[in-house]
């Protein structure tokens, strides 16, 4: 696991559009199919004429770690999480390709610069080499000479830091988003805040194939 699910990796979205009654909220929160529970709850929200608008990364430490890597990373990850719900795709490379097409952050794409892929590769590498969501990060890597990857079949891959591009490409090609349990971390439930606004949390958990 590159990034484990925890409250620190919650991304908070505001539900905007048609107002939802307490009955609507209870009904959506009670949706509990054996598969695709989060997608079904998301679809129920959108069917009511609502949409999710990214609000913030809940944990200030993780938020600061992401901003230190790149100020746009919180918004990029939020768009990846929404794209996963809309498309059903979970591999990070495919999700990045899809948001590169839609370009939600409005980057200048005239020269086909790989903005989204570059930033996500930087995040994956940093997570692999020491950056943890709930710990303030200095920007220094834990490993000095290289990195060993033990695959599920027992094969061991060795990447030296002078070959960082290959290491980044390996992570990028093999990383996928995994949904954590909806019974933990206030994940994928509609929450009525004290100010009356409605929140819906998505969790950012990254594993390797």
Residue spans of the language-model regions?
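Short, positively charged
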Residues: 1-209
